[in-house]
A protein has these predicted regions:
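Charged, compositionally biased, marginally structured helical/coil segments
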Residues: 1-93
Length: 93
């Protein structure tokens, strides 16, 4: 999963897709933090990666709801666009 995110970051840079790039860089940051956590042995299982992705998607949706409540639809739209990118990596439900 980590390698897929890294290669998709390169593709987003080449395509100059700023929203996708921001979302994927955020995901990679959390993956690196999980890999370097004490006891992680510099590894990240797919199960742990999916938990991180689900957490980030939920946080993004919650943040967007707060933005809407504060009449900041522009920020909510940006946040929801990033959530959509993250949800591409989650299994379909």
């Amino acid at each position: 999963m980590f390698e897929r995110i890294s290669s998709d970051i390169v593709a987003a840079m080449k395509a100059q897709d700023k929203v996708r790039l921001m979302a994927l860089r955020s995901v990679k940051k959390y993956f690196i933090e999980a890999k370097t956590a004490p006891g992680a042995n510099d590894e990240l299982s797919d199960e742990a990666a999916l938990k991180i992705l689900a957490k980030l998607a939920k946080q993004g949706r919650d943040t967007a709801a707060i933005y809407v409540a504060q009449s900041r639809q522009d920020l909510a739209d940006e946040e929801l666009a990033q959530v959509a990118v993250i949800e591409e990596y989650l299994p379909k439900q």
